[in-house]
C-alpha cells in the first residue's frame, strides 16, 4: 500500500512538516510559509465553546429494541412493533464541572438519548435521577451559577451551593438523591436513566397519555463512597469514560431496560399533586411501571470531538405520537437546548453526521438555507420558499401530538397547588426508604458540605428543610453539622 501524501488544507503536497521556512539557517521565519501559518491558525481554532452545563461527557452508539406492545398508547413508529430495532446514540455527562473535570464526582449525570427513527430524530434528554432541583426555568441560570465555579475564587463554593438551596425548598428531594449513595455512580454502566420530565403519548385513535421514562440498568446499581470517589478522581479523572470505552471494546455491551409510567390525560387535573412538577415522582402504586424495550450500546465513536463533543440534543426533537407536557422546566428546555447548540455549533449543527436525521435522504427537508458551515447543497431546482409550484417539501397537516387544553389569564403564576403539593413529603419518603448505612452516608455527606458554609442563617434554612422532610433526618444532619463545627 502506497504512503498517503500529507497536504495543506487546499490539497497541495507538503514538502517539509519538521522545519519552518526561514530567511537563512538562523534567520526569522517567513510569513509566506503557507503550511506553518495554516497549521498554527487551524490549531488556534480547534476548540469550540464548551457546553454551559453537561460539558464533561462520554458517548456510544447502539440500538433500542421493542420487547413489549405499547401501540395502544402511542403511534410512534419506532415503538409500534415488537422486535423492531432503532439505532441510537447515548451521551452521558456530569453537569456542573468543565470539560476537563473528573468523572467520579458528586453530581447528577446526564442521560441524553437520540433515536434515529424512520420518522426523524427523537431526543430524550434526561438524567440519572427522576427529579430535579427546581421546577421553573426562570431559576435555571441562577441555579447553575450557584453550582459552578465562583467568579472570584474560581472554585465551587459551599456558600453559593447551599445558599441557593436555602432559598429553594423544592430542591430538597433532589438534594436527598444527590447526597445519598446514588450521587456518585461507580460508572455510567451502573446507573439508571430517567426522562425526568412528563411527556405526552398519543395513540392512533387520538387518545393521549402522560408518560414518564425509566431506563433500568441491566448491570445493577453500583456507587462510590466519597472517599472512594476522591481517590479514583485523582488516579483516573476519566474513569467513567475509560470504563465505558473498554467495556464496549471487550464486547461487554451495557444495556438498560426501558419502562414507562402512563397517566390518562383526564386524570392529571385531579391528581393529588401537580403531575408536571419535575421535583416529584409519580408513585408506582398509582402508576406502575410498564416494560417497553431494551437499550444496548455496542459501538464506540471513532472521534470523540466529532461525535460526542458535537452531539446536539434537544427535548424539542419529537416524532409523531410523542409530544411535550405543561411541565414548566420542560417548556423552558424546549427553547434553551436548541438555542445553545446554535450558539455553540452554529445554525447548521443538524447537518453534522451525529445529529443528522437518517429518515430523510440527504438530510432534513425544509427551506432553511445558508448560514455558517452550510454543507447541504440545496440550489438550482430546490426552491427556498414555500408554498411553491415546484414539488418542494410540503406540510402534512397532521400534528405530532394531540393538542393540550389550556385556560386562564396570561401572567406569572405560582405552580398549581394540589392536596399534597408540598416540597418535602417525597424527600422524607426517600429518606425513610434508605437503610441505616445509607442514612449515615447521606447525613455525613450533607454535614460535610454544610459545615463549610460561613453564614449561620443559610445553615439554619437548609436544616429546616430536612426537618420538614423528616424530623429524624433533620435532627441527624443538625447534630452532624454541629459536631464538625466544634472540631
Swiss-Prot record:
A Gene Ontology BP annotation from the UniProt entry: response to hydrogen peroxide
Residue positions binding heme: 337
Entry annotation: catalytic residues: 54, 127
Keywords assigned by UniProt, alphabetized: Heme, Hydrogen peroxide, Iron, Metal-binding, Oxidoreductase, Peroxidase
Catalytic activity of the protein: 2 H2O2 = O2 + 2 H2O
SUPFAM superfamilies attached to this UniProt entry: Heme-dependent catalase-like
Keyword Hydrolase attributed: no
A Pfam family of this chain: Catalase
Protein EC: 1.11.1.6
Family: Belongs to the catalase family.
Protein name: Catalase
Organism from which the protein derives: Streptomyces coelicolor (strain ATCC BAA-471 / A3(2) / M145)
This protein's encoding gene: katA
Amino acid at each position: 500500500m502506497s504512503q498517503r501524501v500529507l497536504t495543506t488544507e487546499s490539497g497541495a503536497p507538503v514538502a517539509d512538516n519538521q522545519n519552518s521556512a526561514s530567511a537563512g539557517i538562523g534567520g526569522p521565519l517567513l510569513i509566506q510559509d503557507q503550511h506553518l501559518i495554516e497549521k498554527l491558525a487551524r490549531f488556534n481554532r480547534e476548540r469550540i465553546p464548551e457546553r454551559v452545563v453537561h460539558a464533561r461527557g462520554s458517548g456510544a452508539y447502539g440500538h433500542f429494541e421493542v420487547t413489549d406492545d405499547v401501540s395502544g398508547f402511542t403511534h410512534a413508529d419506532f415503538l409500534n412493533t415488537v422486535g423492531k430495532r432503532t439505532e441510537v446514540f447515548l451521551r452521558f455527562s456530569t453537569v456542573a464541572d468543565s470539560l476537563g473535570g473528573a468523572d467520579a464526582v458528586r453530581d447528577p449525570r446526564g442521560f441524553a438519548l437520540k433515536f434515529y427513527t424512520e420518522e426523524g430524530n427523537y431526543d430524550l434528554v434526561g438524567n440519572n435521577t427522576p427529579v430535579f432541583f427546581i421546577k421553573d426555568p426562570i431559576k435555571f441560570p441562577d441555579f447553575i451559577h450557584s453550582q459552578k465555579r465562583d467568579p472570584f475564587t474560581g472554585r465551587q463554593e459551599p456558600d453559593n451551593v447551599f445558599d441557593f438551596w436555602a432559598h429553594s425548598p423544592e430542591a430538597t428531594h433532589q438534594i436527598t438523591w444527590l447526597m445519598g449513595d446514588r450521587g456518585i455512580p461507580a460508572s455510567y454502566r451502573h446507573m439508571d436513566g430517567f426522562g425526568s420530565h412528563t411527556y405526552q403519548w398519543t395513540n392512533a385513535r387520538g387518545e393521549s397519555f402522560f408518560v414518564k421514562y425509566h431506563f433500568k440498568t441491566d448491570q445493577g446499581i453500583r456507587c462510590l463512597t466519597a472517599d472512594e470517589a476522591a481517590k479514583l478522581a485523582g488516579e483516573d479523572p476519566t474513569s467513567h469514560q475509560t470504563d465505558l470505552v473498554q467495556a464496549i471494546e471487550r464486547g461487554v455491551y451495557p444495556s438498560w431496560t426501558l419502562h414507562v409510567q402512563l397517566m390518562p390525560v383526564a386524570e392529571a387535573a385531579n391528581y393529588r399533586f401537580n403531575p408536571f412538577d419535575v421535583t416529584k415522582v409519580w408513585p408506582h402504586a398509582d402508576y406502575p411501571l410498564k416494560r417497553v424495550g431494551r437499550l444496548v450500546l455496542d459501538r464506540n465513536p471513532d472521534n470523540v470531538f466529532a461525535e460526542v463533543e458535537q452531539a446536539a440534543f434537544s427535548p424539542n426533537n419529537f416524532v409523531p405520537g410523542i409530544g411535550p407536557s405543561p411541565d414548566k422546566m420542560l417548556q423552558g428546555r424546549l427553547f434553551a437546548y436548541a438555542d445553545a447548540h446554535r450558539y455553540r455549533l452554529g445554525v447548521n449543527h443538524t447537518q453534522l453526521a451525529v445529529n443528522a436525521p437518517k429518515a430523510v435522504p440527504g438530510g432534513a427537508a425544509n427551506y432553511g438555507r445558508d448560514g455558517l458551515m452550510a454543507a447541504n447543497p440545496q440550489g438550482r431546482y430546490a426552491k427556498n420558499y414555500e408554498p411553491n409550484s415546484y414539488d418542494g417539501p410540503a406540510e402534512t397537516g397532521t400534528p405530532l401530538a394531540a393538542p393540550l387544553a389550556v385556560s386562564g389569564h396570561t401572567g406569572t403564576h405560582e405552580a398549581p397547588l394540589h392536596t399534597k403539593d408540598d416540597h418535602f413529603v417525597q424527600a422524607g419518603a426517600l429518606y425513610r426508604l434508605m437503610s441505616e448505612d445509607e442514612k449515615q452516608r447521606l447525613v455525613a455527606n450533607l454535614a460535610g458540605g454544610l459545615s463549610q458554609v460561613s453564614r449561620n442563617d443559610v445553615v439554619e434554612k437548609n436544616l429546616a428543610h430536612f426537618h420538614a422532610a423528616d424530623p429524624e433526618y433533620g435532627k441527624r444532619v443538625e447534630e452532624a453539622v454541629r459536631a464538625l463545627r466544634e472540631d
